[in-house]
Amino acid sequence: MLGSLLAVALAGAAVVGMTGWQIAAQKDATLVAPSQVAGLRLDESENGKSTADYLQTALSAEVDLDQAVGAAYLDAGGHNVLFFGGTALIWTPKNDLDSAFNLISDDQGAVTDLHDVPAGRLGGTMRCGKTATDDGDMTVCGWADHGSLALGMFPRRTEADSAELLRQIRAGAQTRG
C-alpha cells in the first residue's frame, strides 16, 4: 500500500515538474513582425497596415496578451498572408488557441476541421483548419505555447503549405528570453 502511494506521488511530482519546466522554458517569449520572413515581405500599404492593426486588436480583445503584433505579408506573386499574435504567460495554450480561432468566426461561419499539426522545433501546440470566404475556403493555422500565441490566415494556399509557412514565420518572429 505504501509502495503504491509512493509510486502515485512520484508520478504526480514528475507531471508537475515536467509542466513546470515547459512553462519556465516557454514563458519569456517575444514576438515581432519582421520586415521579411519565409520569402514574404511586409505589406506596408495603408490597407495592409489597417488589416494588421484590426486583427491585432481583435486578438487582444479575445485573448489576454501582454504584447501583441500584427502584419500583412505579400509573397513574390502578390498573394497575402495575415499574421497576428502576442505574448503572455499562457497557462492553457490549447484552450487559448481555440479561443483565438473563435475570433475568425463571422457571418460566413467559423474555422472548421480544426486538427493538430506538428508545431516544429519551438514546440507547443499547432492547429490548422479552414474558414469560408467569398473566394472559397481559406486555411487558418495557429500555434500556442506557454509564452506566445499567433494565428496566420493563408488565402489560396494548401493546408500543408500554410502549416509549413507558419512554422517558418514563427522561427523568424518568436524568440525566448
Language-model features, listed with the residues they occupy:
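A short acidic-to-branched-hydrophobic micro-motif
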Residues: G70-N95
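Short Gly/Thr-rich strand-loop-strand
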Residues: D98-G136
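Hydrophobic single-pass membrane-targeting/anchoring helices
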Residues: M1-K27
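Short extracytoplasmic
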Residues: Q36-D66
